[in-house]
Amino acid sequence: MERDFLGAIGKDEEQRRHAEERKESDYFGAGGGAAAAAMDWSFASRAALMSFRSSSSAAAAAAREETRELAFPHFSALDGAKMQQASHVLARQKSFGAESHGIPQYAAAAAVHGAHRGQPPHVLNGARVIPASSPFNPNNPMFRVQSSPNLPNAVGAGGGAFKQPPFAMGNAVAGSTVGVYGTRDMPKAKAAQLTIFYAGSVNVFNNVSPEKAQELMFLASRGSLPSAPTTVARMPEAHVFPPAKVTVPEVSPTKPMMLQKPQLVSSPVPAISKPISVVSQATSLPRSASSSNVDSNVTKSSGPLVVPPTSLPPPAQPETLATTTAAAIMPRAVPQARKASLARFLEKRKERVTTVAPYPLAKSPLESSDTMGSANDNKSSCTDIALSSNRDESLSLGQPRTISFCEESPSTKLQI
């Protein structure tokens, strides 16, 4: 009788309390109120993964719990505190971050298993906190939280036990594995190859450090600076120019000789041109006797021109070179046709001069150089040329020419 009386009195209050709990569970995302029952979490006695029960078993368990509560109602003064505790657990689950990833949050039902049978059975949708003595191993790599490599897993920096942050069973972090990054060891730069091109050959050296390469380049740059002037200085030594430079100062002692004989050493070009004019005159003369005399005179005149400079000991070599070059140039200087025309021109000019000017002072410098001598000899030669027209004329012409090559008379005439 007392049980029926107590059940009738508390029936209305029990129904009102259940309605409020369902509204609160719907607000925190437990499901669709009375239509969708809460999912039951089953915990094994050993460390294993969680498994979900089917919806039919969950509905049957919920029906059994309702019938038990109706049959044996139980009232306690700690019901309000338990409701606040459940709301705090749900708020903690939300703050952990599972709601932000879009994962539905389910409250763990009060399963009647083993050590959990001591909890009050009338709390239907209340959340349950995992106790400190959890069957899950915190050192399991599946539940290990990524941390610094210097921080140990079991012991913190202060020496106490390492405290892991609280997490819900439906959290995505629980089933994730964290990879370990390998050490980033930068490979050392290998020594480069050194390639040297020298004298048309290629030399390659391996494992040459930059310092050694810089030293080699520095030595090469230092060696290239003095080598350039030395090569320039050695090049002229291979040529014949230095002997020519040595002979230039040796010609200077011949200056006193040039003062004594200015006609012979004054310039090499006129000395070469004079024998050419004499040879042309000799070839142009019609008489055989005059040609023979002129040739003999030319050969005789060439002797004094060459012998005095060769007699001097210092300038012996340059004078011999000059004579050889003059002998090589003489036949090549004037062609044969020009020689004949020049001889005819000189012959006619000589005839005009002799007919117009009977005195030797009016002669041209070329003819005066050919007919050099004393004043008496020149007068006699001019009279002989004007009066004679036979072989005596040619012989008289030869006499002043033989005398004209004396060493004393030409100097006086040219200076005046």
Curated annotation (Swiss-Prot):
Tissue occurrence: Expressed in roots, shoots, leaf sheaths and leaf blades.
Annotated Tify domain residues: 187-222
Gene that encodes it: TIFY6B
InterPro entries: CCT_CS (IPR018467), TIFY/JAZ (IPR040390), Tify_dom (IPR010399)
Function: Repressor of jasmonate responses.
GO cellular component, one term: nucleus
Induction of its expression: By methyl jasmonate (MeJA). Induced by drought and salt stresses.
One GO BP: response to wounding
Record text on subunit structure and interactions: Interacts with COI1A. Interacts with COI1A and COI1B in a coronatine-dependent manner. Coronatine is an analog of jasmonoyl isoleucine (JA-Ile).
Source organism (scientific name): Oryza sativa subsp. japonica (Rice)
Protein name: Protein TIFY 6b
